[in-house]
Design a protein with these regions (language model features):
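Conserved phosphate-binding/catalytic region of the ribokinase-like
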Residues: 1, 6, 29, 202-307
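Conserved phosphate/ATP/ADP-binding segment of small-molecule kinases
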Residues: 154-159, 164-234
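Conserved N-terminal subdomain of the carbohydrate kinase-like
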Residues: 24-30, 50-133, 299-307
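Glycine- and other small-residue-rich loops at beta-strand/loop junctions that grip anionic moieties
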Residues: 59, 84, 137-139, 162-163
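Structural motif
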Residues: 4, 133-134, 183
């Protein structure tokens, strides 16, 4: 468990609104609200810290109370922010509206990370970045910045994972040189955006990414489970049927669980099972982070699911 992980991307304050009934558009809908630290990369970071992974974060925070709350929370969780930037700006915010079944209806994101996590900024941190074994980046950053991280990771043989975040943001990867990227984790809609080819055949879309130099594509398929594609191997994993409380952060949790398994020396299937297990736990709660999680609990959840 000695490998270290560096995550680079957006940190936000999440405001989630859970509508009491099926949403009526163009009207006011009664709802309950929860507030927490969010952003794809921060959800991943928080779960890795709970699983006792040596994890650090490069992100952009504002000069406000939200930033102080985030900094203090992460410091108490053992998450290093030493190379992050604090700007004279407002900390980013993610607002989502969820239907009564817990599924996302619509969301909006105000994010300062592309403005402040730039190539010159990261160039000044290059010696720090290359000290980590695994680098995880989200697509909230500018496409040129993402390309710089890909190139740095390739030249220093670092294991780079890209989390696509959303369809519009995943499209930033469509014209990038992905050679050397270890893994990308899209859902089916994000896969279409990344592949940027005319065909809509899943096999051809996956093949196009493999030919562009990606080693693994972990395709998330919702209630159908997920499939890990490699050049000479295909690993498929189903998921049990559960009642969803909140779908926010499930994919982030899955990646954190997979990274934990990978660092813990598990094979691909077991790492995927750990990812699914953590995602299923997150689907059962309001919010994107299961704060009671630890490595022993995660292995027990996996065991229970497989029984």
């Amino acid at each position: 468990m000695s490998k270290s992980v560096l995550c680079i991307g957006a940190t936000l304050i999440d405001e989630l609104y859970f509508c009491e009934n099926t949403i009526v558009t163009h009207s006011s809908n009664p709802a309950e609200k929860t507030t927490s630290i969010g952003g794809v990369i921060s959800n991943i970071v928080q779960h890795l810290a709970l699983l006792d992974i040596n994890v650090s974060l490069i992100t952009a925070l504002g000069s406000d109370g939200d930033a102080s709350f985030i900094s203090n929370t992460f410091k108490n969780s053992g998450i290093s922010l030493q190379e992050s930037t604090v700007a004279d700006d407002s900390t980013g915010k993610y607002i989502s509206i969820l239907n009564s079944d817990g599924n996302l209806f619509v969301s909006a994101c105000q994010d300062i990370s592309p403005k402040y996590i730039t190539i010159p900024f990261l160039e000044s941190k290059a010696d720090y970045i290359i000290n980590f074994d695994i680098i995880v980046v989200d697509t909230n950053l500018d496409s040129k910045t993402i390309q710089w991280i890909i190139d740095l990771s390739r030249s220093h043989q670092k294991l780079l994972i890209i989390e696509p975040v959303s369809v519009p943001k995943a499209s930033k990867l469509s014209n990038l040189n992905l050679d050397g990227v270890y893994m990308i984790t899209p859902n089916e809609e994000e896969l279409l955006a990344i592949a940027s080819i005319e065909t809509q055949t899943e096999k051809e879309l996956i093949q196009s990414l493999l030919e562009r130099g990606v080693t693994k594509i972990w395709l998330r398929k919702g209630h159908q489970g997920s499939v890990l594609h490699e050049r000479n191997q295909l690993t498929t994993l189903s998921v049990p049927s559960i009642t969803i409380v909140d779908s926010t952060g499930a994919g982030d949790a899955a990646l954190a669980g997979w990274i934990f398994g990978h660092i813990d020396g598990e094979d691909e299937l077991t790492s995927m099972q750990l990812g699914h297990s953590l995602a299923l736990e997150v689907l059962k709660i309001k919010g994107a982070v299961e704060s009671s999680m630890n490595r022993e609990k995660l292995y027990q959840v996996k065991k229970n699911i497989l029984q």
